[in-house]
Swiss-Prot record:
Gene Ontology BP terms: protein localization to spore cell wall; spore wall assembly; sporulation resulting in formation of a cellular spore
Keyword Cell wall biogenesis/degradation: no
Domain Follistatin-like: 267-289, 335-359, 400-423, 430-452
Signal sequence segment: 1-19
PTM description: O-glycosylated.
Domain statement: The N-terminal part (1-200) directs accumulation in prespore vesicles.
Record's keyword annotation contains Glycoprotein: yes
Protein name, entry field: Spore coat protein SP85
């Protein structure tokens, strides 16, 4: 009895430390649940131009080496990855990521599928997802030119999410998380499939309590634990031919010398299966079996009908309006496990049509955008620039031309967006090389050339007299006095035969184009104005 208790306690301790393992595979893109064109990768790198990624965006686990092990509250992801675009490339990495179960209960799920895929419109329920926060992780390189990639955390502090539809690509059971390396993001999108391992066989919890069904045919192999009432004088010559009149009232104090003829009955009450699996007894052994039936997205509109227990005695008088009474058998769910595709192709499983096809690998043209950071126009003061590093906002001074030293024959310029550039110097021009428009002339001011407007001459007589050094007001007063003395009208009404001019210009417009003005009766010369 004590031995059985020790064995039972040891088995319970082993069951408490039993770890569940999952096989990781690339998450395919389901066009019925998402508009995203990417998919079928385990890891996707946002900035593949960094030297540690060798120019490759997509990385997958090699030879089904991706394993996710959950032991209590700790998750451990391991495996070997290679670039999917060039499978013959010699760059390889060993993956080692550690996560811890999040128990805060205030995590917002990252929904990357269409809104119609989630409840109440679709079958995916984010309330059933589990979350694991990042602890540590790295890629250790091997092969040619090995390098190491050490991750600093998760984008925005978002944890890894696990469940049906959590991979962000389809509705299967999977995981997804955005890890940070420097200033770039490494996206994980994987489907998971549990690896069924047989748990250790439980010893019998109680000794057998049933009495023997037949009398013993041979004497006991060991002496009884209690002394006999009197010593036997000789061994019996033949076994007794009749059974005992009544069974023993107490169990034996020692374990049976022979094993029981039947194994102990297994019970599913103590075996916990992962999501998507249930316990069944097969050949008297407990095992976790995959759920083959897909739960309906809406309740049935009618109650199911059952086949009749007896055949009808009379044929029906009218044809039935309902479908056959026997339920259709559920076809097996399509799987890519046994499908081998040629080079350059991969297997995709369409659960809506329940078929598995080999499709050509395509270079992804669209990448998921990382979550927007919190930088706003008013986050920093004037002259500072806002940046977001690992989910935190920092204000750094903007670069100006005072802080930039350009090479020889170059100078610094700053555009409207505050960006600073070193541009080559232009050769200096002279006014002889600049062509200005009409009525403009070239002028050099502070080392810069400008075309300025030059007012053309108006041709008025006052301007000509002023150019000769006469005062315009005095000249007009002298002309008015002279005309008043002669008793004549102003010059614009003088007949054209009473005056003459050197240039024979028309005086009807009221302006004197020439300098000399003469009259027929003796004349008036401009030199006579010296007395005024």
């Amino acid at each position: 009895m004590r031995l059985l208790s020790v064995l039972l306690i040891g088995f319970l301790c082993l069951a408490g430390t039993y770890a569940q393992k999952y096989q990781l595979s690339p998450a395919y893109n389901d066009p019925y649940l998402t508009d995203d064109k990417t998919g079928t990768h385990d890891f996707w790198v946002q900035n593949a131009s960094l030297p540690v990624f060798y120019g490759f965006h997509d990385w997958n686990f090699q030879d089904n080496s991706g394993i996710m092990e959950i032991n209590g509250d700790e998750m451990h992801i391991t495996g070997k990855i290679y670039p999917t675009v060039n499978m013959g490339d010699c760059h390889r990495y060993n993956v080692d990521l550690v996560f811890k179960k999040d128990k805060s209960g205030n995590v917002m799920p990252k929904k990357e599928l269409r809104e119609s895929a989630y409840v109440p419109h679709g079958p995916i329920d984010p309330a059933t997802w589990k979350y694991y926060t990042f602890v540590q992780g790295k890629w250790t390189g091997f092969g040619c030119d090995p390098q190491n990639v050490v991750f600093s955390g998760a984008e925005g502090g978002m944890p890894l999410q696990l469940g049906y539809g959590a991979n962000g690509k389809n509705g299967d059971n999977g995981i997804s998380v955005w890890l940070i390396y420097g200033y770039t993001i490494v996206d994980i999108n994987c489907n998971i499939r549990p690896i069924i391992t047989q748990s250790p066989t439980q010893p019998p919890t109680q000794p057998p309590t049933y009495p023997p069904t037949q009398p013993p045919t041979q004497p006991p192999t060991q002496p009884p634990t209690y002394p006999p009432t009197y010593p036997p004088t000789y061994p019996p010559t033949y076994p007794p031919t009749y059974p005992p009149t009544h069974p023993p009232t107490y169990p034996p104090t020692y374990p049976p010398t022979q094993p029981p003829t039947q194994p102990p009955v297994q019970d599913c009450s103590t075996l916990e299966c992962p999501e998507g699996f249930h316990c069944e007894i097969v050949n008297n052994r407990r095992t976790c079996v995959c759920d083959t039936t897909v739960p309906p997205t809406h309740p049935p509109t009618q109650s199911p009908t059952y086949p009749p227990t007896q055949p009808p005695t009379q044929p029906p008088t009218y044809p039935p309006t309902y479908p056959p009474t026997y339920p259709p058998t559920q076809p097996p769910r399509a799987s890519c496990d046994n499908v081998r595709c040629p080079r350059g192709y991969h297997c995709e499983c369409n659960h809506w049509e329940n078929v598995a096809r080999c499709v050509r690998n395509e270079e992804p043209t669209h990448r998921p955008k990382p979550p927007h950071h919190g930088c706003r126009p008013d986050s920093c003061a004037r002259g500072e620039k806002c940046i977001c590093v690992r989910g935190k906002i920092y204000c750094i001074p903007k670069t100006t031309c005072d802080q930039v030293r350009c090479p020889r024959k170059h100078h610094c310029e700053c555009n409207r967006k505050g960006q600073v550039f070193c541009v080559p110097d232009c050769p200096k021009l002279t006014c002889k090389q600049v062509g200005c428009p009409e009525n403009h002339e070239c002028v050099s001011r502070r080392g810069e050339l400008h075309c300025v407007y030059v007012r053309p001459p108006t041709g008025r007589w006052g301007d000509d007299l002023s150019d000769l050094g006469y005062n315009q007001a005095s000249v007009e007063a002298a002309i008015d006095a002279y005309e008043a003395q002669r008793g004549q009208r102003p010059h614009n009404n003088i007949p054209s035969n009473n005056l003459h001019q050197e240039n024979n210009d028309n005086l009807g417009d009221g302006f004197y184009d020439g300098v000399e003005i003469g009259f027929a009766d003796g004349g008036f010369d401009v030199n006579d104005l010296n007395g005024f």
